[in-house]
Structure formats: structure tokens, C-alpha cells
From Swiss-Prot:
Disulfide bonds: 54-69, 61-74, 68-84, 93-108, 100-113, 107-124
UniProt keyword list: Disulfide bond, Ion channel impairing toxin, Proton-gated sodium channel impairing toxin, Repeat, Secreted, Signal, Toxin
Domain note: The presence of a 'disulfide through disulfide knot' structurally defines this protein as a knottin. This toxin contains 2 'disulfide through disulfide knots' that are separated by a short linker.
Role played: This toxin potently and selectively inhibits ASIC1a, an isoform of the gene ASIC1. It incompletely inhibits ASIC1a activation in a pH-independent and slowly reversible manner. This toxin acts by binding to and stabilizing the closed state of the channel, thereby impeding the transition into a conducting state. In vivo, this toxin protects the brain from neuronal injury when administered up to 8 hours after stroke onset.
Domain of life of the source: Eukaryota
Gene Ontology annotations for the cellular component aspect, listed alphabetically: extracellular region
Protein name: Pi-hexatoxin-Hi1c
């Protein structure tokens, strides 16, 4: 795809610089048909690549605020970390005794993520 774009742009540039009358009809056809298709395909592919590189929910978006996946926005946590969160979610902090696994800094005020013994997930508990 990128080769087709490069060749099309090179042809257009050469035609503009040299103004070859013999190839004028060829250039008109290229501009009318192929070039439009080539650029449309390139834009579509670029969008697909961008969508594949989006940042998932609760993952860091530091330095990439506009790259959260669809339905998510970059939100700055209390402790300075930025993560992608659902746009419609109003309360981002985790309430008392809720799991804070992979969300260590998201406990509500007066709570902290408490590591429990054994193989249990950590929970938000009152600060000690």
C-alpha cells in the first residue's frame, strides 16, 4: 500500500515539474481513479492501525492522553498516575473493602490499598 502511494505521489510530482504533454491523459486518469482510491485506502488503514494501538481500560495513558480506546478517556489519579477510564463513569475511587488489584492508587479518601495475607487480592481499607 505504501509503495502505491509513493509511486502515485512520485508520478504526480514528476508531472507537475516536467509537464509532459504525452502523459497528460495518463495523469488525468491516475488522478481521477487510482489516486483517490489509494489515498482513501491509506486513510482507512491508518485508522485501523490507530485503533489497534489504543490503550485499554485501567492502563497507563501517561504521555498519550488521546490514545485511550473508544469509550475511554485519560484520567489523572490522585497520586499522579494517568489511566484510561470509562467516559460515563462518575465515581472513580474504590469504596471500602473493594478489590484494588491493579488499581493500587484508586481507593477513596481515608482508604488505602491493603495487601492481605495469602493469595487474596488486596482491598481498600481504612488508613492506619
Amino acid at each position: 500500500m505504501k509503495l502505491r502511494i509513493t509511486l502515485a505521489l512520485t508520478s504526480v510530482l514528476a508531472f507537475c515539474v516536467f509537464g509532459d504533454k504525452e502523459n497528460e491523459n495518463l495523469m488525468e486518469n491516475l488522478l481521477e481513479d487510482d489516486l483517490l482510491d489509494i489515498f482513501t485506502d491509506a486513510i482507512h488503514m491508518e485508522r485501523q492501525e490507530t485503533n489497534q494501538e489504543c490503550i485499554a481500560k485501567w492502563k497507563s495513558c501517561a504521555g498519550r492522553k488521546l490514545d485511550c480506546c473508544e469509550g475511554l478517556e485519560c484520567w489523572k489519579r490522585r497520586w499522579g498516575h494517568e489511566v484510561c477510564v470509562p467516559i460515563t463513569q462518575k465515581i472513580f475511587c474504590l469504596e471500602k473493602w473493594k478489590s484494588c488489584f491493579e488499581r493500587k492508587y484508586d481507593c477513596c479518601e481515608e482508604l488505602e490499598c491493603w495487601e492481605r495475607r495469602g493469595n487474596k487480592h488486596p482491598v481498600c481499607a481504612p488508613k492506619q
